[in-house]
């Protein structure tokens, strides 16, 4: 496991009720969902939590048409605008993804791309990431994903509270790692 925690900021989270939106970038009910559930176990008592599951939504890829910059959201008649409304209303966003080809999943990237339609409404959020992959956590894949989120955080003035990376190759392997489960519950 790797990552940093802003302990002062996390202490402040304990004192404030927040609306947390979790974007589950995994289509499977495996190690990424296990990590999400551990986080929820620790955070749900004091916060309102909603999970967005992109694989269950009808969201078309961004066309890059730019119309959204002159109107109130994406022109696609799909689940984009209601999904982005939920993200924009959140105090904290948790991005969770398995590693696919040294990057985040297509499901998560699709939602992030569609956030372009209301990027300014996503400024100044508290953010965390959970990344689960099949290589040891000192592998370049986690660093690449963390750097991508760090760039987004800088651009949108996000307060990046934590980047957590976990190694799990077999289904349900993450659940057996008591240290990481306790760590996620403690965030």
What function would you assign to each model-found segment?
Residues 2-96, 102-118, 154-169, 173-187:
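N-terminal beta1-alpha1-beta2 submodule of the flavodoxin-like/Rossmannoid cofactor-binding fold
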């Amino acid at each position: 496991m790797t990552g940093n925690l802003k302990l002062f900021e996390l202490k402040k989270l304990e004192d404030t009720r927040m609306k947390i939106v979790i974007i589950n970038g995994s289509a499977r009910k495996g190690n990424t969902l296990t990590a999400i559930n551990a986080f929820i176990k620790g955070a749900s008592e004091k916060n309102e939590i909603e999970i967005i599951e992109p694989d269950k939504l009808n969201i078309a890829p961004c066309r890059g048409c730019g119309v959204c910059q002159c109107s109130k959201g994406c022109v696609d008649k799909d689940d984009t605008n209601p999904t982005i409304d939920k993200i924009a209303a959140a105090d904290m966003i948790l991005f969770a993804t398995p590693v696919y080809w040294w990057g985040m999943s297509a499901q998560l990237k699709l939602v992030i791309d569609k956030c372009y339609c209301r990027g300014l409404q996503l400024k100044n959020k508290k953010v965390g990431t959970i990344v689960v992959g099949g290589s040891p956590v000192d592998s370049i894949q986690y660093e690449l994903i963390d750097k991508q989120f760090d760039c987004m955080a800088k651009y949108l003035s996000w307060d990046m509270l934590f980047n957590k990376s976990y190694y799990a190759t077999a289904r349900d392997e993450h659940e057996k790692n008591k240290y990481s489960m306790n760590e996620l519950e403690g965030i």
